[in-house]
Amino acid sequence: MIKKLLGIAPTPTEDGAFAPSRLALKLATSATTNYDGGAYPTPYTGRNARILVVLTEERNMTMANGKKFSTGNHPVEMALPMLHLISAGFELDIVTPTGAPAAIEMWAMPKDDAAVIKLFSDYADALKNPGSLADFAAKSLSDDTPYVGVFIPGGHGAMLGLPDNADLGKVLRWAHGKDIHTITLCHGPGALMSAQQDGNFIYDGYEIALFPDAVDKQTPMIGYLPGHMPFELGVTLKSLGL
């Protein structure tokens, strides 16, 4: 009751999970972003100009206490890189593991940001009916590829259904071998765990930036998360050599 009065109680969702508390939303989200349209006076015009955008289709993360956190792909961490890539001349193809609709953290949507809202409108069908990562892994890993990048956005949802996805691992190892760029941020690096194979990890020795475990440990206090994380992402990735 006290947490509810103070606005730090996680907000129940219709499916039995929890979204962030009122205070957490006030502290961690914004109605607008700092996107300025990008600065790309000479956009890329080459033949190979496609980016594969890999999104999670899973919604709820089970926390250490058994409660479920309503998550998905973070709209800002997804939209702003996409906007920059589009402005720089690239075309985007969206996939989820099975082709099911992409899960979006709608509670984090910057509702007054015209550029972000337009992007979600433009890609509404692609988000509802994305391509299948499984099909891509089976049919599109060619030597003569139009793809120059793989983008995995952030959001705690990137830790659901992607870290152990064999198809994603196959795509990442292919991209790595072809010197295709891999782009990810915040909790997105969790998906890189899928690239493990036979005790080898292609990113062993690399350095990355990701959301700190120390912050994830603190956010339950303000109701951003309904419980502590099921595992420490930074510690886990470091154990693999990152």
Language-model-detected regions and their locations in the chain:
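Conserved active-site segments centered on acidic
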Residues: H187-P189
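Extended, subdomain-level signal for the structured scaffold at the beginning of enzyme domains
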Residues: M1-K178, A191-L242
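Conserved, well-structured core segments that form or line functional sites
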Residues: T182-I183
